[in-house]
Amino acid sequence: MATPRSAKKAVRKSGSKSAKCGLIFPVGRVGGMMRRGQYARRIGASGAVYLAAVLEYLTAELLELSVKAAAQSGKKRCRLNPRTVMLAARHDDDIGTLLKNVTLSHSGVVPNISKAMAKKKGGKKGKATPSA
């Protein structure tokens, strides 16, 4: 007895795990890295999805802050370079604590003038210290 054509099984579209979850970061690659790194004996399927989503969120947040910092530089063109990414990360409290031990190459240092090096206002000019 043949089955009618309308009773065929529903064909499921194939696609990546990232596309199924609505993410840009590669869920399969993150899961493979978790398994190869041997962080645990068993890793569930949702663990890779969750980690990829967290990484994607943090990256989007850092890029958003970097674009704002580059736009505030006052130049006509907005260009992202390691320096603007580092400055944006260091000036944000949450991301700054996450990345406080991270060194970004070709980014320089955060400009900071210590109070001891700053010029003191209201100093007396007339008195000179005797040198012996």
Curated annotation (Swiss-Prot):
It is found in: Nucleus; Chromosome. InterPro entries: Histone-fold, Histone_H2A, Histone_H2A/H2B/H3, Histone_H2A_C, Histone_H2A_CS. The keyword Cytoplasm does not apply. One of its GO terms (molecular function) is DNA binding. It holds the Pfam family Histone_H2A_C. CDD domains: HFD_H2A. Signal peptide: none annotated. Keywords: Chromosome, DNA-binding, Nucleosome core, Nucleus. Gene3D superfamilies: Histone, subunit A. It comes from the Eukaryota. Belongs to the histone H2A family. Core component of nucleosome. Nucleosomes wrap and compact DNA into chromatin, limiting DNA accessibility to the cellular machineries which require DNA as a template. Histones thereby play a central role in transcription regulation, DNA repair, DNA replication and chromosomal stability. DNA accessibility is regulated via a complex set of post-translational modifications of histones, also called histone code, and nucleosome remodeling. This is Histone H2A.1. The lineage of its organism: Eukaryota, Discoba, Euglenozoa, Kinetoplastea, Metakinetoplastina.
